Amino acid sequence: MIFSALAIVLPAQAVEQFRQLKATEISAKFTGMEMTDEVHWAKVFSKDGTYISYSMGVKRGGKWRVTKDELCIDLSNPNFQDHCYQVWLSGNRVQLRETGIEIFDEGILQKPIPRNL
């Protein structure tokens, strides 16, 4: 009987909750890192503010910055607006959420992987 109660309680405690990051935390976590779904896309946040995205074999460049507790991406393309996201973290899992939009990007943070495109 005691074993059954522990089996139910332990998995619930092991699950980490996502929490929203502040500006200094965003900079510390993203600088020099890559966010990826490990299959289809990756977003690289270089130390010099350069942003590179790889998606389905297409490479795009731009700049990234942190403004008012949000991660902002400028794709340096007049056809794309700058986007700023709230950053939510749980372990190495990260979510980029836009205010007022329920769909968000989710992936992991890791050291950048070299790519040839």
Describe each model-derived feature in a short phrase.
Residues 9-63, 67-117:
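Lipid interaction determinants
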Residues 1-7:
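Bacterial N-terminal signal peptides
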